[in-house]
Every structure is written in structure tokens, then in C-alpha cells.
Amino acid sequence: MGATSGIGRAVAEIYLRNGHQVGVCGRRTERLEEIKNKFPDNSHIATVDVTSNESISAFSRLIEEMGGMDLYIHCSGYGRQTENLDADTEMQTAATNVMGFTRFVGSAYRYFVANSRHGHIAFISSIAGTKGLGASPSYSASKRYQWIYAEALEQMARMRGHHIRLTDIRPGFVDTDFLGHGHYPLMLDVESVARSIVHAIATSKRVAVIDWRYKLLCFFWRMIPTSVWVRMPVHS
């Protein structure tokens, strides 16, 4: 999901090059057609908007067309800096990263349960969930939501004996359209990040922070008391 550009597309193309049957979903039909033309034998496409309830039916049809699903990867995301707490930005972020995330991750979980399949759900969250970021309030809060939702699903799976694994991918700044290819500290290359994601999924990591520099950063972030953090002039 969210595989028409950036990290999602890079990850999808790794699996496609390796010969896997891959269902590729996203909002931009023309980008989906590009992928289909590039990998005609093992790509299956569906135009899906995670903010729409109606898109669930397209997602379900795609799974049926493929003959089932073993791994679901959720890469859809939205976020912008909002100095003046722009209402449209905040609500669109929540609609995509909270409602859309819940809609499709939940749908994948229910699919695995209903079909008695051993399933794996992976998703791209962010190190932004580590602390509340004044430059992007809704974005950082939505990423923390994703962390906790996955934790709850993992507990549910264990309680009820569902064979479903979860992998939470937490990258830092990645050079993609999402950031407008701007200049940010510790910028990561999208292809390198995609390879790290595929490795994390293959090794069933529960949480994967990409890369070591961001692991170190998050370690120190967590040590900062909230009373100190809220006084710090942190910018995304």
C-alpha cells in the first residue's frame, strides 16, 4: 500500500525483481501502470485511496485476484510542517496516518484471521513518534499512534493464538518526494532504506530503526524529560 512513489515503490520493486507476486496499491493510476508495464508477469495493481472506505473493496478484489496474501506492507503516509497549525494539514495527516492506517492494517489483520493464514504485517512509521514535534504536531502524534496500534495487535494475536507477525519500520529523513527532495540532516538514500526494510521483514524484526545514526538519536531523545523537551527549539 502506498507503492506508487518513494519508499513504497522502491520496496515493491525489490520484491518484484526477486520474482515475488506483488500486489501494488496507490492513488496514482499512471504510476501503477508504469509498474505493471515494467513487471508484467508478477505485478498486480489496484488504485486505492486509504482515506476512502470504498477502497477496501478494491483491496479485497486484488487479494482474491492474486490467490491470497501472506505479507502486507503499509507505506502510505502524509505529513507537512505546519508553523501555524494549519487545520487542513492536521486533518489530512490524521485521515491518512491514523484513519487510513487503521482501515487497511486492520483489514489485513482480519484477512489473516478469517483465512487462518500465517500472516505478516509491516508498516512504515517514523522516528517522529519518539517525541512530540512542534513543527509537525499531527504527524508525530500519528506515528506514535501507529506504534501503539501495532503493539496492541501483537498482544491480540498472542492472546487469541493468531499466527500474525508485525514489523514496525522507523526511518529518519529519506530523500523522496515526501520531503520534496529538500536538504535535511542525516538524509538517507531511498534505495538503501528499501533494502534495509526488506531485510527487516525477512528477519521478522519487530521494530527496525533505520539507520544506526537514528538509533543513537532516538536513544538520546528518550532520555530528555518532557519538561525539558517542550522548551527545546526543535525543527524538522
Predicted regions mapped to residue ranges:
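Short alpha-helical oligomerization interface
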Residues: 82-95
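Active-site helix of classical SDR
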Residues: 105, 142
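Conserved NAD(P)H cofactor-binding loop of Rossmann-fold oxidoreductase domains
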Residues: 73-81
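Conserved glycine-rich cofactor-binding loop
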Residues: 4-5
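Rossmann-fold cofactor-recognition segment
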Residues: 39-54
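Residue(s) in the substrate-gating loop at a strand-loop-helix junction
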Residues: 126
